[in-house]
From Swiss-Prot:
InterPro entries (alphabetical): Cyt_trans-like, PPAT, Rossmann-like_a/b/a_fold
A Pfam family annotated for this UniProt entry: CTP_transf_like
Gene that this sequence comes from: coaD
Residues reported in the UniProt entry to bind substrate: 9, 41, 73, 87
Keyword Transmembrane assigned: no
Protein name: Phosphopantetheine adenylyltransferase
Length: 157
């Protein structure tokens, strides 16, 4: 049985994230979506809100669970007994960044990373950009689920 961890800040959850989760669910026996904190960004949602949003949008995927990740990724992977880390990549910049992080996780935690290229339709989706345009009332329904839109609207009133 191969267990994978898909870590991220998911602030907000996008259709690109959901695509990586659903594709991972087909590839691995168990997928843990690990909700971490990105200290270099200001979060719009709490960890609990993110867990609820992800859980509600993945409830049809029986081999997917969602947990908070209070630690470094390689430590979390070890603590849940996972075999690999999964990351989505949209472009060359993502690849270079993820390759470097994968090397660190391998050296420190002896864990491999599987990189899933984004489908073309999701390559331009950036959580940071979506938060910014949503603050000004732009329609982001092509990029995020409806429950995410509702929560963004509540938070940006």
């Amino acid at each position: 049985m191969v267990k994978a961890v898909f870590p991220g800040s998911f602030d907000p959850l996008t259709f690109g994230h959901l695509d990586v989760i659903s594709r991972s669910a087909l590839l691995f026996d168990q997928v843990i979506v690990a909700v971490g904190i990105n200290t270099s960004k200001t979060a719009m949602f709490t960890t609990e809100e993110k867990i609820t949003l992800i859980s509600n949008n993945t409830k049809n995927l029986k081999n997917v669970s969602v947990l908070p990740m209070p630690d470094l990724t390689f430590k979390f992977v070890s603590s849940v007994g996972a075999d690999v880390i999964v990351r989505g990549i949209r472009n060359v910049r993502d690849y270079e960044y993820e390759r470097d992080i994968a090397e660190i996780n391998h050296r420190l935690g002896n864990v491999d990373t599987v990189l899933l290229p984004s489908k073309a339709v999701y390559q331009d989706i950036s959580s940071s950009n979506l938060k910014e345009v949503a603050k000004f009332g732009a329609d982001i329904s092509h990029f995020v689920p409806e429950n995410v839109i509702k929560l963004i609207k509540l938070k940006t009133k």
